[in-house]
Amino acid sequence: MNKLQEIDQEITYWYRERLKLLHPLRQLFWECTLRCNMACRHCGSDCKTVSNVPDMPFEDFTPVLDEVRLHQPHIKTMVFTVGGEPLVRKDIIECGRTITEKGFLWGMVSNGKLIDSYMMNELSDAGLRSLAVDVDGLRDTHNWLRNDNNSFDVVYNAIGHIKKAPHLIWDVITCVNSRNISQLEEIKRMLIEAGVTKWRCFSIVPMGRAKDDEELVLSNSQYRYLMDFIVKTRMEGKIQLSYACEGYLGDYEGLVRRSHFLCSAGLTTASVLSDGSISGCLSIRSNYHQGNIYKDDFWNVWQNRFDKYRNREWMRSGECADCKVFKYCQGNGMHLRNNDGSLMFCNYNKLFNSK
């Protein structure tokens, strides 16, 4: 790590300490449905076409929006509708329109299957400002991961409609696994030719359907290759590639994404799950819920709970007990913790302390 990286790392540490005290809510995720029109191999939520958990009525979520707007009117909070697949909700356009009318920025994460010209126009007219869609490889590897032989063609067509939308910040997400990692150069060329300017690469966490699927999890050498590929691509400057927000990456910090690692869950990010549970980010599938909107005042929960998120000293156990980089890592992302507090895996060790 060079001197500039070390300085940025210290700045990030003190910035995190400040956020622990202030915790401004900048991102609010609403799990608006657990229904999905796909059955992806890596789904962390194990979503299905018909969910055992009904969609939350939008009128149950709107009081949360009103509380947030009342208590921090000066902050432009981004509200993300996620699932499942949010576009399977018949009222999603009206939900987004109301979110926008209440003074929030509206964002969405979608598999792209239902995005055509008409849908994109409807989303834009309702105020959509941020959108992420998935392209998980070339045709064969994308369709394999998505368990759908038509998925690649559909999402590729969707990109053509998305890039025409005005005032929209959008990017493509690729979940990198052992099948598509050898295709990264080809995927990069394909995305650039399709007019994609922003690209994010994720590694797959062993949870949900991916828990026991070894093909989805990168080996240590593959993980290092991914980091080196991102560094090289960022230096080329042909497409804005970054690694996902998960995990402390040691010497790669500041090189594979715009800022150094900082798990924003409970600091600037909260989520309302489909059953009303209040949590950090929706990538957290373990039970670190802090309350429920059907029983608790959301803003009171945000202000006065979330101690496990804001004070990470409880994570100094197991492989984190004597870790020399704990000050900067803070026990890794909350989504990488099991219910018992143990760490699923360590990004830093995967990169630097493996044989």
Task: Identify the residue ranges that each predicted region occupies.
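Residue-level recognition of short loop/turn positions
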Residues: 39, 83, 273-275
